[in-house]
Amino acid sequence: MEQPTSSTNGEKTKSPCKSNSENDEMQEVPNRVLAPEQSLKKTKTSEYPIIFVYYRRKGKKINSNQLENDQSQENSINPVQKEEDEGLGLSEGSSNEDEDLGPSEGPSKEDKDLDSSEGSSQENEDLGLSEGSSQDSGED
């Protein structure tokens, strides 16, 4: 029983360790080769940034809400001018209400257009009635 068996032989136990270390080295080499390629792919994707383009129409019809927002922004941009205007108005004796009235507070262009179109439509109706009666008499 004192004879060395394959499992108890020191050299044979060392040989599997050597083969394992050799396999480990071989496995490390392909990993090292793959690592630079992966890093190159990552840098290639970062070289091309994503660009978003947004176009806005200038001739687009503006809603009344947007118009009021734009005017409020204009007022907030130049608070110094507004204060100067108020200071001049007080020295002249005029009220601030007259100066504070801007295009947004008074009747807007759209309102005036609506009023004029309503008036013209009423006139057209009146004219249409008189014309209609004359046309009816002409057809008989």
Swiss-Prot record:
Belongs to the SPAN-X family. InterPro entries: SPAN-X_fam (IPR010007). It holds the Pfam family SPAN-X. This is Sperm protein associated with the nucleus on the X chromosome N3. Signal peptide: none annotated. Residues 1-20, 62-79, 131-140 have a biased composition (Polar residues). It comes from the Eukaryota. Residues 1-140 are annotated as: Disordered. It comes from Pan troglodytes (Chimpanzee). Coiled coil: none annotated.
